[in-house]
Amino acid sequence: MKQYTATANDEGVRLSRFVQSVTRDFPTSLLYKSFRNKRIKVNGKKGVPEDRIKAGDLIELYINDEFFPPEGAKPTRKPAPKKQQNQPKVTVIYEDENIAALYKPTHLLCHSDRTGDANLVDAFTQYLAQKGEYDPQGENRFKPGICNRLDRGTEGLVIAAKSYAALRDMNEIIRTDLLKKEYYTITVGIPQSGRFTAWWEHDEKNNKVSIHAHQSQDERRKQIITDVDVLRTAGPFALCRIGLITGRTHQIRAHLAYLGKPVLGDIKYGNRKMNERTGTRTQALCAVRISFLDIPEENTLHYLSGKVIKLKDPQIVKQFDGLDKNKQAPAEEK
C-alpha cells in the first residue's frame, strides 16, 4: 500500500489521472477494477475516478508494488536537448503565489518544439526551481505552464501559471473572455481608427490565414473583430494600439494586411520591399497590456478582478521613434 498527500499542484486533478501519474505500466483495465474493488481511497473513503483532488487529501493505493517506481527513483523525464539546458533569464513584470506575468522577447518560443531552441516555459520552470518553488526532478504530476501564447516573432506580456489550479482557472478566465489584451504595432501605411470586422480562415497545413469580407457557403470561416487606434504617424508609418475583441491565430497581422496596412517586418503577411528598405527583420508587434474583468468568486484567481498589468517603456515605441527621426524613410509602396 502506498500513501500520498496531495499538494497544491494536485488541486483539481482527476483522481484517475493522479493514480496514473504515480504508477508505472498500470493497465487502464486494472485501474478501474481497483476503483470498483475499493483499492483506491481518499481520506479513508472509496475513491471515484472522476473525483477532483484537493490539497491535503490523503490518497491510499492498495495496488501491487510492481506497478510503482522503485523507492527513491526519480520521475522519468525525457532529457532536454542540450540547447534547452541553459534557458534565458526570465523578466518578471508581475508575480504572486499563483501566477506571473512575463516579458517574452522576440524570437523566443513560448513552448518547446522539435528544434530544441530555448523557450519561455522551460525558462520559467528554471526560474521557479532556482527560487525553491518547483522541483523539476521530484514533481511528476505538473509542470508550470503558459496560459496565453504569442507567436515566436511577437514580443510582450505572457501569463504563466505556477500550479495546476492556477493554470485551470486562468484558462477558464481566457475561455470566458474575462482577460483582455492590447498590443502596439507599427503599420506600413496609415490605417483608419475604428472597429473592423471580417471573416477568418486558417490553412493549418501551411499555417497561414486568409481574411474575407463574407462568410463562406460551407460556413468554415470564423468572424474576427479588431479595434485599431492610431497613436502617432511618421511618414508612411503609424504606431497603433490594437484591441482584440476576438482572438484568432495571426488575427492582428492578417487583418491589418487585409486592410492594406500590414505590420512592419512581417514576413508572412507584410510588405517585403518596405521591410527590406527599413532593414526590419522581425514583425513590429508587442503585447503591452493585460486587463482582467469581473472574475467569478468561485474562481481561485478572483482577486485579479479589475487588475491591469502593463509593459513599461516597450521597445516597439523606441523602434517607432527611430523611424520618426529617419527623414529618409521612403514613401509607401503602391
What are these regions (language model features)?
Residues 1-334:
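RNA pseudouridine synthases
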